[in-house]
Amino acid sequence: MNRAIVIAGPTGVGKTKISIDLASELNAEIISSDSAQVYKGLNIGTAKITEKEMQGIKHHLIDIVEPISKYSVGNFEKDVNKILNQNPEKNFLLVGGTGLYINSVTNGLSILPEADKKTREYLSTLNNQALLELALKYDEEATKEIHPNNRVRLERVVEVFLLTGQKFSELSKKNIKNNNFKFLKIALERDRENLYNRINKRVDIMFEQGLVDEIKNLYKIYGEKLYKLNIIGYNETIDYINGKISLDEANYRIKLNSRHYAKRQFTWFKADKEYQWFNLDEVSEQEIVKTIYTLFNIKA
């Protein structure tokens, strides 16, 4: 079985430096696993790696779609598996913090059906009580975990049953993995106070580098479609550009939302017990790279 390495962790933890050093040691290519860095032109606000920082290491799935294009976990899963399956002899690092994307490759995608327009139109005609009753009828287990007023999730439970005849709660546990790779999963962390300080500092640097100008230019081209991407750093700055909040408030909100996002990322990766964790406040980057290199070669 072929093998690859995952380098995951929360935003701002320091994945880039370690991934570049490790890729150099292993003569590996890097597959960006970041849901925002696929978009062209979104550079400063996504802390996108620069050509200089790449140090000649080949990177995949950066700057591949326009901000008006839809790019989903399904697109990512297909793109990554194509790269892996066409180059089984190469070493690859999946590097990023979008857990759902990484999981789609390492553990496979759910076999749940895609949304169906006609079914959604029908369900939209039902009142909340009727929808809740249908959801309970078709899948009581899943429905018990959903707030009675959460129409989006209730509609999905009913939709899945109508389309497949099977329960959402059962299908959602079944995945299809479309590659023959085994993944060495590495996650990076720091002490929380230090991580949050790094995040705050990085946001300040983004503003110094010209975040507002970057987003002004993008907003002129893409308008509200840019806002609909719902990417931290961009929505808050667009609110500032539109006069809804001050620049200081935008800065504050980006820091706050980034810290909250880091916490969610940490929780996501901790839930997967296959990850081996390294604390960058306790172990040097060089030691971590050396250890990962050894683990990869021992188990290769």
Question: Can you name each region flagged by the protein language model?
Answer:
Residues M1-A300:
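Phosphate/pyrophosphate-binding catalytic cores of soluble transferases and nucleic-acid-acting enzymes
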